[in-house]
Amino acid sequence: MNDAPLPRGRHHQQGPVINATTSTAPHQPAPAAPDTAIRPALRALSLGAGVQSSALLCLSADGTLPKIDIAVFADTGWEPKKVYEHLDRLEREIAAPAGIPIVRVSSGNIRNDALDPNHRFASMPLYILNQDGKQGMTRRQCTGEYKIKPIKKKIREILGYPYPSRVPKGVFVEQWVGISTDEFHRAKDSGVQYMHNAHPLIDIGWSRADCIRYLERLGLADTPKSSCLGCPFHGNAQWRSIRDASPSEWADVVEFDAAIRQGNARANATGNPLLGQAYLHRSRVPLSEAPIDHVTAAEWAALRQETGAPDAEDLETGVVDGCSPWACRGEQPEPVRDDFGLAV
């Protein structure tokens, strides 16, 4: 769908701050103190179309939270069909009636870029089996390139200071990020002065479970996790869901998994080949052969020892909250390198 018209930067109006000091003149009210607080030019939502960010959009649309001026969805070009369908529904049924524009931004197609020898590729966190049999991972750069970068670019444009213009001090956007109380430790700032991250779900004391119940009441119980179709942080349950519910998408990820076995095309073309083999699944076997079906407790124990999974729940559920630009749950559990060579 086409991007809705963008709001120009403006300051939100709030009531004056009243000086509560007792007046020295009898029967005279204390004068209002000057309102010198620096306010955001506008409020924006980092919309991943997962549970928490969807809940924030709905809470703003129904008036429970202040109205946001814009929601920005960073499209990696390889989101599951369920995410695109859910995003369309949010725009049609929630955002548009409330007058909240949803803008879609992109830095390219992460799948195509990985297989294009002429394109710089920001690496995905692939599971590596080194030539000496040791295990490792490639460094996660995809969130910065395909999520954070296009959002920052759009915010600069909205403020009227596109790169490389300098954004004046004091000009900033209040950016809402979908972090709930059960993951408050993930809350962090944006790293740039023109975007101040806010976490309204923490402010109102909502957990992920609260968000799910709220979305269920709105008829949005099928809100998906927000992550790339072929995200290596998927758990077995997510891989099974793709395989069983969407054969075409399963064929897509199986094909991609095989295509990146020797590393990304750009690295190979420039003489920096992967010194090992890359896989999408933690087991470090081809995705078409990976043990993604439910197994017994004894099998869990054996598989956990074999794959190095910290626990069976992680292997099954994967990244619980999907991929958020400023709060990716994909912490590096194993040694990495910046390049796409040997993971040590």
Where is each model-derived feature located?
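Nucleotide-activated chemistry modules centered on ATP-dependent adenylation/adenylyltransferase
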Residues: 2-344
